[in-house]
């Protein structure tokens, strides 16, 4: 019973729960040594050990002539030598690099013996003072000597080989081949009966042949390339085997008073409608100029590209006559001209 009361009613003594360890905020030995060394490195010479400023020394002189106090800064020897080289006058000789920071302790460096080596800046200044020579891109092993011998005599034959005077086809001949041999050989060749002077064969650029002349005096119904009422499919059938630039004029299927220009391009057949302005002028598209009649428009664009999108590079070159529609496919495709093949 006593054990039950002690365990369940907490009437007996109870142990406290475990507590986390108490943090130690004391400074370690390594950190303390580092801090002391840091204070020594950046010690102010005008302060005492307690960090208080030293009292000013009062003298009998005028205080306005007292020099201000300066802090001492540790300077490396290499930095001091570099600063002296930058701040020194141009005519001053550079001093030798030493381990001391005091410039008064450095001794001037004796001039080094001439070993043939020169700094790039000095070499550039020396080369600018000397007369400029042509830049030599490569070494010539047979370079002639520019200096003459002291005795005044001839400097001897040049080591550079003489240019080979033989033609390209006679490299197998001996070295003693001379000009007279070449002259005689070419004279016999040129004076022969079979020699003919042929002009230089230059390839002239091919120019397209001009289109067939369109007679503007004839009416539209009497033009050979006017087919009258013709369906779209029949026009495409006629132009399917024709060359690029072939054309015909036909009447529309839906509206008999409208004329259509059927044209063969590199992408197939194109059908363009002729329109009339208020002044009864004929135009072909928005960018076409007005013309009095369709034959005059066809004559104009037989020598100029059409102002129609998709046919800017085309002209009305090859008319498809009405007689060809009764004979069958376009006979112009049977004999393609040079530079133009079947589309």
Curated annotation (Swiss-Prot):
Any coiled-coil regions, as ranges: none
Superkingdom, taxonomy of origin: Eukaryota
Residue ranges of domain SH2 in the record: 225-320
Statement: the UniProt record of this protein carries the keyword Phosphoprotein: yes
Cross-referenced PROSITE patterns: SH2
Listed Acidic residues bias regions: 92-102
SUPFAM superfamilies: SH2 domain
InterPro entries named in the record: SH2, SH2_dom_sf, SH2_domain_adapters, SHD_SH2
Protein name listed in UniProt: SH2 domain-containing adapter protein D
Organism: Mus musculus
């Amino acid at each position: 019973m006593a054990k039950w009361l002690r365990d369940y009613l907490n009437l007996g003594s109870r142990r406290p729960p475990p507590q986390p360890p108490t943090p130690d905020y004391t400074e370690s030995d390594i950190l303390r040594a580092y801090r002391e060394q840091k204070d020594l490195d950046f010690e102010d010479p005008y302060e005492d050990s307690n960090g208080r400023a030293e009292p000013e020394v009062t003298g009998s002189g005028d205080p306005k002539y007292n020099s201000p106090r300066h802090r001492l800064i540790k300077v490396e020897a290499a930095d001091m030598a570099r600063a002296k080289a930058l701040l020194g006058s141009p005519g001053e000789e550079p001093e030798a690099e030493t381990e001391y920071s005091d410039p008064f302790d450095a001794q001037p460096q004796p001039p080094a013996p001439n070993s043939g080596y020169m700094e790039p800046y000095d070499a550039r200044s020396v080369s600018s003072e000397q007369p400029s020579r042509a830049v030599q891109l490569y070494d010539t092993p047979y370079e002639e000597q520019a200096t003459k011998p002291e005795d005044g005599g001839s400097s001897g034959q040049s080591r550079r080989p003489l240019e080979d005077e033989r033609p390209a086809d006679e490299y197998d001949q001996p070295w003693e081949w001379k000009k007279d041999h070449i002259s005689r050989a070419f004279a016999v060749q040129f004076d022969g009966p079979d020699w003919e002077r042929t002009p230089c064969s230059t390839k002239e650029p091919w120019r397209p042949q001009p289109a067939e002349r369109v007679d503007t005096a004839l009416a539209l119904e009497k033009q050979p390339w006017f087919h009258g009422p013709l369906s779209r499919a029949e026009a495409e059938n006629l132009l399917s085997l024709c060359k690029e630039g072939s054309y015909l004029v036909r009447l529309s299927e839906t509206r008999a008073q409208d004329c259509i220009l059927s044209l063969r391009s590199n992408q197939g057949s194109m059908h363009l409608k002729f329109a009339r302005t208020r002044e009864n002028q004929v135009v072909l598209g928005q960018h076409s100029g007005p013309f009095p009649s369709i034959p005059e428009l066809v004559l104009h664009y037989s020598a100029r590209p059409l102002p129609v999108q998709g046919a800017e590079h085309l002209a009305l070159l090859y008319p498809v006559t009405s007689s060809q529609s009764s004979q069958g496919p376009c006979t112009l495709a049977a004999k393609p001209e040079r530079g133009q093949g079947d589309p």
